A protein has these predicted regions:
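Bacterial N-terminal signal peptides
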Residues: 1-10
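Short hydrophobic alpha-helices and adjacent helix-cap/hinge residues
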Residues: 15-373
Length: 374
C-alpha cells in the first residue's frame, strides 16, 4: 500500500504538468470540421500531449469581443505556456499575433486553415510555422461536372468578404475554362451579387433562391454572412436551407458541411489536416524550432457523400479514384460459407424431383403386387 501511494504521488506532478496543445478555432460553433481536426491532432499525438480546443470566435466579432476573450483565456491559462498553440483560421492567427506578449508567452505557433500569411505577420507571431491552405472552387466545379455533366445552371452562394469575392472570380474563370474544354456549358450566377441585383443575400432571399434551383442545376456554396435581427442566420442554417429546398445538389469547398446533405467538393479533410498538424507538433516537441520549418502547403482532394449523390442518380463508377467517400451504402453480403440463392433454389428443385420419382416408383411396385392385396 505504501509503495502504491509513493508511485501515485510521484506520477501526480507529471500528470499535472503534462504537455498541452491549445487549438484555437476561428468559429463560435463546434461543427464537423472542428471535431475532425481535433480528433486527427489527438490521434497523431498518441497521448504525448493533451489537446485543448477553444472556440475563439469569427473575426467579424470585432476588437471588443476578442479583448473579452483574451481576458477569459488569461484567467483560464494563467502563466501556463502550452507546448504549441495551433491557430485554426485567420481570426485565431490574428488573435495570437495580437496577444502573444501576454498569453501563451514563448509558445511556438502553427497556423492552418488559411492561405500563407504575409511575411511580416509571420514575424509578429514569433516562433511560427504553418500549413497553408487555399479553398479550390475551380477543382470543386470540375468534380461537379465529372459527376453531373448535364448540369445547366450553377447557383453560387457567397458573402460580402474580399476573400469570398476572390473565390467567386476563381469560380467564374474556372467555369469559362470548363466551357472552352467542352466539359460543360452551364450558366453561372451569384444571386445578390450580380449587376442590378447587388444587395446581397438574407435568409428570406436565400430560401427563395434555393427553391428556384432547377433539377438540372446545382449550388456552389462559398459562404454566407452572419446576420442579426429579424432575418438572423449563419452559414450552418444557410446550408440546411439550401439542402432542404434545392432539387439540385449542393457542393462546397470545405468539409465543414459534409454530413449535412452536401454532395461533395474538393477540400482538405479535417482529420487529415489534424494529422499533418500533429506531425509538426511532434517535431517541435522533439526540439526543432518552429521558425526554421518551411511552411508545408496541404493538398485538397475530392470528398463525396455517396448517399447524397445516389439520390441524384450519380453512379459509383464516376467517383474519382482518389476521393474520400463518405456514407457509402452497404452492399448486402452473404455470410462466409453461405450457399448462393441460385444454387440453393436448384438444390431444392432437385430434392423435390427426387421425392416425386421415389413416390412414383413405390406406386408402381404396389400396382405389380404378385399376391392378393392385404
Amino acid at each position: 500500500l505504501l509503495l502504491a501511494l509513493l508511485v501515485a504521488l510521484a506520477c501526480a506532478p507529471a500528470r499535472a504538468n503534462a504537455a498541452e496543445v491549445v487549438l484555437l478555432h476561428s468559429t463560435d460553433r463546434d461543427d464537423a470540421r472542428t471535431r475532425a481536426l481535433a480528433r486527427g491532432l489527438a490521434d497523431a499525438l498518441t497521448g504525448r500531449a493533451a489537446v485543448v480546443p477553444v472556440l475563439l470566435g469569427r473575426r467579424e466579432r470585432g476588437d471588443d469581443y476578442f479583448d473579452s476573450r483574451f481576458e477569459t483565456l488569461r484567467r483560464k491559462f494563467g502563466e501556463r505556456s502550452p507546448a504549441v498553440v495551433v491557430a485554426d483560421g485567420q481570426a485565431a492567427f490574428a488573435f495570437v499575433r495580437k496577444y502573444r506578449e501576454d498569453l501563451f508567452v514563448g509558445s511556438p505557433v502553427i497556423y492552418c486553415s488559411m492561405p500563407a500569411p504575409d511575411p511580416q505577420y509571420l514575424r509578429q507571431c514569433g516562433d511560427c510555422t504553418g500549413l497553408p491552405e487555399t479553398a479550390d472552387p475551380a477543382a470543386t466545379l470540375k468534380l461537379l461536372f465529372t459527376l453531373r455533366p448535364q448540369t445547366g445552371l450553377i447557383v453560387g452562394i457567397m458573402d460580402d468578404s474580399p476573400e469570398t469575392d476572390t473565390l467567386r472570380r476563381v469560380s467564374e474563370e474556372a467555369m469559362e475554362a470548363i466551357r472552352v474544354q467542352g466539359l460543360g456549358q452551364a450558366r453561372m450566377l451569384f444571386p445578390g451579387h450580380e449587376p442590378g441585383d447587388d444587395a446581397g443575400l438574407d435568409m428570406a432571399r436565400l430560401r427563395a433562391v434555393a427553391s428556384s434551383v432547377p433539377r438540372a442545376g446545382a449550388v456552389l456554396f462559398l459562404g454566407f454572412p452572419d446576420l442579426e435581427g429579424e432575418e438572423a442566420g449563419n452559414e450552418g442554417e444557410a446550408v440546411r436551407q439550401l439542402v432542404s429546398r434545392s432539387v439540385g445538389p449542393v457542393f462546397a469547398a470545405s468539409d465543414r458541411w459534409m454530413g449535412s446533405g452536401v454532395a461533395g467538393g474538393v477540400m482538405v479533410p479535417g482529420r487529415e489536416l489534424g494529422a499533418a498538424v500533429g506531425a509538426l507538433v511532434l517535431r517541435i516537441m522533439a526540439g526543432e524550432p518552429a521558425g526554421e520549418m518551411l511552411p508545408e502547403p496541404v493538398t485538397p482532394r475530392p470528398v463525396v457523400d455517396m448517399t447524397v449523390l445516389a439520390r441524384f442518380g450519380v453512379a459509383r463508377e464516376l467517383i474519382p479514384a482518389d476521393a474520400m467517400v463518405l456514407n457509402e451504402p452497404n452492399r448486402p453480403q452473404e455470410p462466409a460459407g453461405a450457399v448462393s440463392t441460385g444454387f440453393a433454389a436448384l438444390a431444392l428443385a432437385g430434392a423435390l424431383a427426387g421425392v416425386y420419382l421415389l413416390l412414383r416408383r413405390r406406386a408402381g411396385r404396389k400396382d405389380r403386387w404378385p399376391g392378393p392385396r392385404p
